[in-house]
UniProtKB/Swiss-Prot annotation:
Organism: Mus musculus
Protein's name in the database: 28S rRNA (cytosine-C(5))-methyltransferase
InterPro entries (UniProt xref): MeTrfase_RsmB-F_NOP2_cat, MeTrfase_RsmB-F_NOP2_dom, NSUN5_7_fdxn-like, NSUN5_RCM1_N, RCMT, SAM-dependent_MTases_sf
Keyword Metal-binding: no
Gene coding for it: Nsun5
PANTHER family: 28S RRNA (CYTOSINE-C(5))-METHYLTRANSFERASE (PTHR22807:SF4), NOP2 YEAST -RELATED NOL1/NOP2/FMU SUN DOMAIN-CONTAINING (PTHR22807)
Gene Ontology BP annotations: cerebral cortex development; cognition; corpus callosum development; oligodendrocyte development; positive regulation of translation; regulation of myelination; rRNA base methylation
Phosphoserine sites (modified residues): S167
Effect of deleting the gene: Decreased body weight and lean mass without alterations in food intake. Adult mice show spatial cognitive deficits, possibly caused by defects in development and function of oligodendrocyte precursor cells. Mice display a reduction of the corpus callosum with a decline in the number of myelinated axons and loose myelin sheath. They also show impaired development of the cerebral cortex, characterized by impaired growth of radial glial scaffold.
Sites bearing N-acetylglycine, chain numbering: G2
This enzyme's EC code(s): 2.1.1.-
Length: 465
């Protein structure tokens, strides 16, 4: 299935409530998911405008075999998008017969509404507002290149490097070809919001990862040293996993689980392109993974980013016919799963640090889940005080909630996110070496006084000469 047919199928699925926009994109068989996702989002955003232009131009009357959703995608590409990709084939020829009329109807619509720009035709709720003011964050994949080399590459392409940002105001002021280094993450570059790098050669080669800053924080706060064993409990689509691998320098082991086969297949492609070699992928429900399994006996770090309502995702603002505000029943079901997954993760015997994160804004999925887990593991785990200067903290729903982090477009210029870092409050005893029950204690482990007594006894048992 080609790009335009795949985009039309996703639009039809969203409209008929077969699933969310992102979920339908991931379940498609199209190879370039990011390209498909971007095209569907933009077509959806201009949906009302495209319907008006198509109707007034009489396109569907003239082309009776052309389905409405495919027509919408094609007209978006012709009038508002990047032009037909890969030559466009028969679709370019088909739309070419109506190009003059379609352009005339778009111009007439602008005159009728008294606007000059395409985006001014959008409804207020669909215009580039707060969601489109969030900068474009680009993580340099240190498994393949260094931040300074990526910066030099962009400079040679005509971008103007402005150095390391010192405040959010520096990020808000970005425009044109300017870019910065993030003030917190040393491998994160920041570009103006509308910068599109999906076709950039460094991105296509896996040297760059297009990842929102808030999505980078869980791996950064987990911070496993090279050589560590790590579990990524709900791993797909894999951006966080690839960041963990970069922090490990591909030294150690990542056990990555996800029960969605299609998402896991897409993840396999992503981590391979990123040069990840220390990750073991498994199509498995994390709740079925046994903490007593010897394969995970050395796991000291767990990242748990479970399924959630996604209410903090910027893309939700584009899903006009999507799932909308999660219902009370759905929130309860999600929170129940999240609670089970978190308590399950805290049972791994060697665990020292766990990061729980969601892209949700709902208290039920965030502070409430964390509070319940702390109560069930009182005295064993506590919340770690992290990033004390981070401006947006957890809701004041329980003592210590200020150690949680929240993120939002308004306060941190990122997508909406929630993060809590658990650390073990007790020392895990080192297992004693295995010895035969009939063997005497190793001499090196006998206290000095006892050792002398044993030596004396041993001497008295020597044969006399």
């Amino acid at each position: 299935m080609g790009l335009y047919a795949a985009a039309a199928a996703v639009l039809a699925g969203v409209e008929s409530r077969q699933g969310s926009l992102k979920g339908l994109v991931y379940s498609s068989n199209f190879q370039n998911l990011k390209q498909l996702y971007a095209l569907v989002c933009e077509t959806q955003r201009y949906s009302a405008v495209l319907d008006a232009v198509i109707a007034s131009a009489g396109l569907l009357r003239a082309e009776k075999k052309l389905r409405p959703h495919l027509a919408k995608v094609l007209v978006y590409e012709l009038l508002l998008g990047k032009g037909f990709r890969g030559g466009g084939g028969r679709w370019k020829a088909l739309l070419g017969r109506h190009q003059a009329r379609l352009k005339a109807e778009l111009a007439r619509l602008k005159v009728h509404r008294g606007v000059s720009r395409n985006e001014d035709l959008l409804q207020e709720s669909s215009r580039p507002g707060q969601a489109y003011q969030v900068p474009r964050f680009v993580r340099v994949n240190t498994l393949k290149t260094r931040p300074e080399d990526a910066i030099d590459y962009f400079k040679r392409q005509g971008f103007s490097y402005q150095g390391r940002a010192s405040s959010l105001e520096d990020l808000r002021a970005l425009k044109g070809q300017h870019f910065l280094l993030d003030p917190l993450l040393p491998e994160l570059l920041v570009f103006p919001a509308q910068t599109d790098l999906h076709e950039h050669p460094l991105y296509r080669a896996g040297h760059l990862i297009l990842q929102d800053k808030a999505s980078c924080l869980p791996a950064m706060l987990l911070s496993p040293p090279p050589g560590s064993h790590v579990i990524d409990a709900c791993a797909a689509p894999g951006n966080k996993t690839s960041y963990i691998a970069a922090l490990l320098k591909n030294q150690g082991k990542i056990f990555a689980f996800d029960q969605d086969a299609k998402r896991l297949a897409a993840m396999a492609t992503l981590v391979a392109r990123a040069g990840v070699s220390c990750c073991e992928l498994a199509e498995k429900d994390f709740l079925t993974v046994s903490p007593s399994d010897q394969r995970y006996s050395q796991v000291q770090y767990i990242l748990l980013d479970p399924s959630c309502s996604g209410s903090g995702m910027l893309s939700r603002q584009l899903e006009e016919h999507g799932e909308g505000t999660p219902s009370k029943e759905r929130l309860q079901a999600l929170a129940g799963f999240q609670q089970r997954a978190l308590c399950h993760a805290l049972r791994f015997p060697s665990l020292q640090r766990l990061v729980y994160s969601t892209c949700s804004l709902c208290q039920e999925e965030n502070e409430d889940v964390v509070q319940e887990a702390l109560q069930h593991n009182s005295g064993t785990f506590r919340l770690a005080p992290v990033l004390p200067t981070w401006p947006h903290r957890g809701l004041s729903t329980f003592p210590g909630s200020e150690h949680c982090l929240r993120a939002s477009p308004e306060t941190t210029l990122t997508g909406g996110f929630f993060i809590a870092v658990f650390e073990r409050a007790e020392v895990v005893p080192t297992p004693a070496p295995q010895t035969d029950a009939m063997d005497p204690e190793p001499l090196s482990q006998v206290p000095k006084r006892k050792r002398r007594r044993k030596a004396a006894v041993g001497a008295s048992m020597q044969p006399s000469t």
